[in-house]
């Protein structure tokens, strides 16, 4: 039983703009979705858990099918999925669920089109004895431990003094493993923080 991490997948039938904006190397959203499902199912077994740290789906007002088709991609994934809501899920909550996180969560957990094990605003995980805070926006990072986040896609880079961006664009569209996170933490402590101090 392993844990995996990603963010900013932006699944949904009308999500072509994300492919264009982020230069994702896929001809269309169908090819992108099919490849992501293949990668996730290749990496994560049915006993594993994938933490999606926001923006699993795309949501724009007046495109209700977009976020619903995006959430439905969860049915194609073999592993357990825990969704930390991002700004796109929050938009869906505000527009389609009367601003109620609980209604959105209930939809994700109980609607036959979805397969999520839980939906949370944020969470903590323990990775090999190190505590990490999971939240979508890096501006909401924890003060008492490292944070795994998304939201900035590739534009904010892989790491910050307070944690790591696990966005799909930063790992060749693959999931980050516990070992990946611990490797980055080791590099950060040994080199990256030192480099930052030298170059500031």
Where are these regions (language model features)?
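Extreme N-terminal starter segment of soluble prokaryotic enzymes
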Residues: 1-4
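Conserved beta-sheet core of the metallophosphoesterase superfamily
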Residues: 99-199
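Core catalytic region of metal-dependent phosphoesterases/phosphodiesterases
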Residues: 6, 11-121
